[in-house]
Curated annotation (Swiss-Prot):
The active site is at residues 43, 45, 112, 114. It catalyses: 3',3'-cUAMP + H2O = U[3'-5']pAp[3'] + H(+); 3',3',3'-c-tri-AMP + H2O = A[3'-5']pA[3'-5']pAp[3'] + H(+); 3',3',3'-cAAG + H2O = G[3'-5']pA[3'-5']pAp[3'] + H(+); 3',3',3'-cAAG + H2O = A[3'-5']pG[3'-5']pAp[3'] + H(+). SUPFAM superfamilies: LigT-like (SSF55144). This is Anti-CBASS protein Acb1. Pfam families: Acb1 (PF23474). 3',3'-cUAMP binds at residues 11, 140, 146. GO terms for molecular function: hydrolase activity. 3',3'-cGAMP binds at residues 11, 140, 146.
């Protein structure tokens, strides 16, 4: 790994099965979520590191969670609705990245899937039973302006 590669940062995320994508879309509809994240954008961030690391993506498709709960997080851009996942797998993959030297901008890692980046003044809470099945992990150079891809 060259110095340039180390300094460019690394992004790793999990993408989910069609079964999970269907369930997430149904959840958005049943909750009447404003500004829903499109199906093809559903993911769970595993690593958002300002330095590159030799992360090896996992292969295989299996359930990584079967439950979670809804939370609204206040962000610089508004109120974001997330499904916080009860996932030891995603937490372990994040710890693997940290063990390899990944940085992390927050005090804790919270595995989640964003359902909307802007729900306005609405609030959501409650437990959710949903099959969260990993389709694949992927990695790419870190994009600091990732929110521009959402528009």
């Amino acid at each position: 790994m060259t110095l340039n590669e180390v300094s460019e940062g690394l992004y790793v995320a999990a993408k989910f099965s069609e079964l999970t994508l269907d369930a997430l879309e149904n959840l958005q509809r049943s909750l009447k979520v404003p500004n829903p994240v499109p199906r093809e954008k559903f993911h769970s961030t595993i690593c958002y590191s300002r330095v590159n690391i030799p992360y090896v993506v996992a292969s295989g498709s299996f359930e990584v969670a079967n439950s979670g709960h809804l939370e609204v997080w206040k962000t610089d851009d508004g109120s974001t609705l997330v499904l916080v996942l009860d996932s030891d797998y995603l937490s372990c993959r994040h710890m693997y990245a940290r063990a390899l030297g990944a940085t992390h901008d927050f005090p804790d890692y919270t595995p989640h899937i964003t359902l909307s980046y802007n729900v306005g003044p609405l609030t959501y809470k409650g437990e959710v039973q949903i099959p969260v099945v990993l389709d694949r992990e992927y990695k790419e150079p870190l994009k600091l302006n990732w929110s521009a891809d959402l528009k």
